[in-house]
């Protein structure tokens, strides 16, 4: 991306939304400090603006990201809807080192792996951050939608022991098993009634349009095309 591009952010901005991108790491990573404005984000927030954040391993924790989202909501312009796109860092690999600020507390029976223990312990913190957001916005006066998803599965250092427990080898998966390694779960939650569905497969390029539809936000011609 080397210039302005239409995106979910620019579309929501055209509808009057305040648009904020936040990523608790370095602004120059993937040129985010340039790309986010090109995509229609009015404000970009990076690691140096996470004042007082709790660090887990080398990264800002997911609960601190939840705190940031809540503060952005509380400080937003009154009467103007808010769109926040938050890319977390807490669970970034690798998982085979020890840290003074994080002690894994979850293990898997039959697996002796620091990577597995660390990864699942980090996921527990992510669950707590999601719970924190849902608890807060359940009581919010404004209609709110939370979309929660990952960009990829953990590395083979985590997956291999789990696969082995199920009689599979990470480097000898058949085509269908390999496809499963490229799937991630997602959640769309709202503090008001929306159409409910479980185990609905989709692709990331369709997710934005799907969220707009379920949230009751008007969609444009391109988004309608994605939804057909």
Residue ranges and their predicted role:
Residues 1-228:
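Solvent-exposed soluble domains appended to multi-pass membrane proteins
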């Amino acid at each position: 991306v080397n210039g302005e591009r239409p995106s979910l952010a620019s579309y929501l901005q055209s509808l009057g939304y305040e648009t904020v991108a936040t990523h608790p790491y370095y602004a120059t990573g993937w040129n985010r400090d340039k790309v986010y404005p090109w995509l229609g984000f009015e404000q970009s927030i990076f690691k140096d603006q996470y004042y007082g954040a709790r660090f887990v391993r080398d990264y800002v924790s997911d609960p601190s990201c939840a705190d940031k989202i809540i503060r952005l909501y509380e400080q937003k312009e009154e009467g103007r809807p808010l769109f926040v796109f938050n890319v977390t860092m807490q669970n970034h690999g690798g998982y085979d080192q020890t840290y003074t600020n994080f002690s894994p507390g979850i293990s898997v029976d039959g697996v002796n792996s620091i990577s597995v223990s660390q990864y699942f312990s980090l996921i527990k913190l992510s669950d707590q951050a999601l719970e924190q957001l849902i608890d807060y916005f359940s009581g919010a006066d404004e209609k709110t939608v939370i979309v929660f998803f990952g960009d990829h599965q953990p590395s083979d250092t985590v997956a291999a022991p789990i696969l082995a427990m199920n009689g599979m080898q990470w480097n000898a998966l058949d085509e269908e098993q390999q496809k499963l390694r490229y799937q991630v779960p997602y959640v769309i939650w709202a503090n008001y009634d929306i159409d409910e569905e479980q185990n609905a497969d989709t692709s990331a390029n369709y997710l934005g349009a799907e969220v707009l539809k379920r949230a009751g936000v008007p969609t444009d011609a391109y988004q309608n095309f994605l939804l057909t």
